[in-house]
């Protein structure tokens, strides 16, 4: 049986591990902090992930589930060990810088494998396959409580530091085929989200590898309840991160919209999930994409391309595999 190692095990990481356990796979979990209990036995290793990565068994399948601030640090050591990496760490660094290591060792990395970036990239690639040259790509995504409150109207389903990175890292967009770097939180505008009402969208740096797919005009927006960003701008520098602590008892949802258009045709997809008995909506929508790609690495390794690749590089068969896996877990994309 193939062994899988998970580096990091937060809320979403725990969900990913559970999905692999239910398929009967043998997992080791490496985290300096003991994770929540699992439904089946895992080999828990209480160790610094970076230290462990440098000595991991060669050609291991590794899930990089670490926060973005440290997730990049394990990539080179893992690739030096010829690892096959399914990478969810939302880091500022471009993993393509490790291409030479990958070529030399045979290590592989599939990066940004979540909902957005991740599934959103796969949908844009599908749009390009169907429409050809893309005039416009617009991605809007957010994970939020189902109703606003008098505070932040938000709770972080993953590392709060990664959320703050979204709000502070300059956003890269494309205008008339030129990549521009603009302030995050710009182009704020109200939108209607079916079933929830009026919400606010603002620019964030979520295009990442899609910057190179060739669209004429492209942008990614994060979606929050109105008032959230005003509060961030006024109080963010003094906030207590505990204010964003995820409350499992509170109803929440994840919503994703991807629109692509050519000169004369448009395609649009919407995903919406309110979570379930198996996990929160963000854990499900993000973690199921990660888990699907991890299962491909184990059960259909021929679907994982050589080298360092973003989600849009996956072939149609791999894209269909991910969609089927999501559907089997109750997530439909319309």
What does each of the following model-derived ranges do?
Residues 25-38:
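NAD(P)-binding Rossmann-fold cofactor-contacting core
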Residues 20:
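Aromatic pocket-lining residues of Rossmann-like dinucleotide-binding sites
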Residues 12:
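Hydrophobic/small residue at the entry helix of a nucleotide-binding pocket
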Residues 45-84, 88-97:
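NAD(P)H-binding glycine-rich loop region in Rossmannoid oxidoreductase-like domains
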Residues 130-334:
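C-terminal catalytic/substrate-binding lobe primarily of soluble NAD(P)-dependent oxidoreductases
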Residues 4-8:
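Conserved N-terminal Rossmann-fold NAD(P)-binding element of oxidoreductases
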């Amino acid at each position: 049986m193939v062994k899988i190692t998970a580096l990091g095990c937060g809320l979403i990481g725990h969900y990913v591990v559970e999905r692999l356990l239910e398929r009967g796979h043998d997992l080791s979990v490496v985290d300096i902090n003991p994770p929540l209990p699992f439904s089946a036995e895992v080999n828990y290793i209480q160790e610094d992930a970076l230290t462990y990565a440098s000595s991991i068994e060669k050609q291991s399948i590794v899930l990089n589930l670490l926060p973005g601030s440290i997730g990049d640090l394990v990539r080179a050591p893992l690739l030096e060990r010829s690892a096959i990496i399914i990478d969810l760490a939302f880091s500022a660094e471009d993993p393509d810088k490790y291409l030479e290591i990958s070529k030399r060792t045979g290590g592989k990395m599939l990066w940004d494998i979540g909902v957005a970036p991740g599934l959103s990239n796969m949908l844009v690639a599908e749009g390009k396959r169907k429409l050809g040259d893309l005039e416009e790509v617009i991605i809007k995504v957010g994970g939020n409580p189902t109703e606003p409150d008098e505070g932040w109207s938000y709770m972080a389903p993953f590392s709060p530091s990664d959320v703050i990175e979204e709000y502070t890292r300059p956003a890269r967009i494309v205008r008339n085929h030129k990549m521009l770097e603009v302030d995050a939180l710009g182009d704020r505008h109200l939108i209607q989200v079916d079933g929830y009402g009026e919400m606010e969208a603002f620019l964030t740096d979520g295009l990442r590898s899609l910057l190179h797919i060739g669209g004429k005009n492209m942008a990614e927006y994060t979606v929050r309840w109105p008032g959230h960003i005003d509060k961030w701008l006024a109080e963010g520098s003094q906030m207590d991160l505990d204010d964003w602590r995820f409350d499992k008892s509170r109803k929440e949802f994840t919503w994703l919209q991807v629109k692509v258009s050519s000169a004369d045709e448009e395609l649009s997809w919407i995903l919406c999930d309110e979570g379930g008995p198996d996990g929160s909506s963000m854990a499900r929508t993000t973690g199921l994409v990660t888990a699907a790609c991890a299962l491909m690495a184990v059960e259909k390794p021929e679907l994982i391309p050589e080298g360092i690749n973003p989600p849009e590089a996956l072939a149609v068969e791999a894209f269909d595999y991910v969609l089927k896996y999501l559907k089997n877990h109750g997530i439909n994309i319309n």
